[in-house]
Amino acid sequence: MNVFQMRDKLKDRLNHLDVKFSFNREDETLRISRIDNGKGVTVKINPIVAKYKSQKEKIVDEIVYYVEEAVEQMKGEALENTDNIQIMPVLRSPSFDKKDKNGNSFVIDAHTAETNIYYAVDLGKSYRLIDEAMLEELKLTKQQLKEMALFNVRKLENKYTTDEVKGNIFYFVNSNDGYDASRILNTSFLNEIQAQCEGEMLVAVPHQDVLIIADIRNKTGYDVMAHLTMEFFTKGLVPITSLSLGYDKGHFEPIFILGKNNKQKRDPNVIQRLEATRKQYENKDKK
């Protein structure tokens, strides 16, 4: 599967939409725009081709779903009902776009050196990032927006699964509601987990649909965490960061794991365990 074949596959899958397609050969991107108002999304083809090698049609299905939802929400600019809207925080990498395609600046708060906080209107199956113009339309201040978002993320359920690898405990939040990574902003939840930790607590948001928390009890745990975050980072539709963050009572500190325990890191039993964990989430997504 090459870039041009993937371009054609996506066009075939999206041909039922009332849109036009524009392919940029230099950037290897496909622009899908509504015919009625010209608004749309731009998809980078090359990363999809790379993921297709391991994920096959699953990654194509995800992209098609994302485009369909985005194009549907671009029918009109105005929010029809601002009385019952749900404001949520979403995490993005510092390299993520600061403006939309029309040049409108998104509302952004700094979080860590590896993460920024954006704000979104929840639309059920998707969400729409809030820009400065929409903030005025909502008649909210930035502080009010932030308070509403943090209040709402604290109301989310925090279901998680646990796994033990080489004596280290790993917690996985993967509800697939679009806000798994956002739960890193729930300080009360993180403090509850920290109270259970016997070693150093690390957290990671490799992509928007997972939050990983680790209780690192020995040196091998750092290598396991590094491998784990990289695995999730490369598989995520909206990647955030492959680095872990040290956590202590509301304070985050980005850390870079050098991988000194390379022999232990490459232990086949550890790798097999990590792959099984990742595939568990892939199978969950397919259901």
UniProtKB/Swiss-Prot annotation:
It holds the Pfam family DUF1444. InterPro entries: DUF1444 (IPR010838). HAMAP family: UPF0354. Belongs to the UPF0354 family. This is UPF0354 protein SSP1020. It comes from Staphylococcus saprophyticus subsp. saprophyticus (strain ATCC 15305 / DSM 20229 / NCIMB 8711 / NCTC 7292 / S-41).
